Each structure stands twice: as structure tokens, then as C-alpha cells.
Amino acid sequence: FLIRRLNQQVDEIISRKGGLANKTLIVEFARGGERGYADALSQLSPEILKRAVILYVSVSFEESWRRNVARYDEKRRSGLLTHSVPRAEMEATYGTDDWFNIAPAHYGTISVKGTNVPYTTMNNEPESKDPQVLGPRYKTALDAVHSLWKRSQDR
């Protein structure tokens, strides 16, 4: 349902004058299931896919669990970013990650419904909140995927 709604909204935006020109739309997916990413990507519209790049932020399950526990704040537990998921739910919902099945290389393109979508995988461990660490980490990954995207647009 959510991806279908996203497709509709993007189609509406694209149909307007100026649409998504010079704009970035970020869609975040969470891992989960033997075909979680593959299934989610396969539901995106061709209009989204032909404009898309993927930045996969790689974090081990154990690190995800550690961050889940660390961000929990009893006093503000109703907050969007302060909640916690029980370990059993984390394992059941997010314990499986199919990303490396569909994108085994560090960067490249994956074919989704006949569209080659550029991607790069960025390791996000160890965790950091330091801009001096995060800046170069993200810059390297985003430069790589931007280069792949530019090459795909030249074809």
C-alpha cells in the first residue's frame, strides 16, 4: 500500500511543471525478510526507478540491536526516534537482509524491472555522530553513486 501511494504521489509531482527538476526525493527502506529489498524495489514505478540511485547503509544486525537499545529513552518513549523494539521482534522483522543477494559488489548497478539502478554500499560502523567522521564517510559513498548515476544518464 505505501509504495503504491508513493508511486501515485511521485507521478503527480512529475506531471506538474518543474516537477522534481533539481530536487532530491529520499525514500528509506528497512531490511526485513528473505526478499525484503527485492520485493520493495520491484514495486517502485518505472518513473521512480529511471531517476533512482540507491545508497545502502550497511549495519550488522548486532549493531542495529545495540543502537535500538541505546536510543530508547524511558522518559520520551512515545517519541518517534526514542522508541525501542523488543529483541524477538527485531530478529523476526529485521533479522534477515537480502541486500547482498541482489547487490553483491560494493557498488554498481542492479536491474529492477529492466531498469539499471546505480547503487553503492556504505559501511556505517562503527557508529559516529562526529561530522569529521560522517562527512568523509558519506561523501565517498555519495560521490561514487553520483558518478554511476551520471554515467547512466549519458547513455
What are these regions (language model features)?
Residues 46, 62-155:
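Conserved GTP-binding G-domain of TRAFAC-class P-loop NTPases and closely related GTPase folds
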Residues 27-30, 47-70:
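Conserved phosphate-donor/acceptor-positioning beta-strand/loop module used by diverse small-molecule
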Residues 1-49:
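Glycine-rich phosphate-binding loop used to anchor ATP phosphates in small-molecule kinases
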Residues 38-42, 53-58, 79-85:
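Short, exposed beta-strand "edge-strand" segments with a Pro/Gly-rich flavor and a Y/T-containing core
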Residues 24, 52, 119:
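Hydrophobic anchor at the start of a short beta-strand
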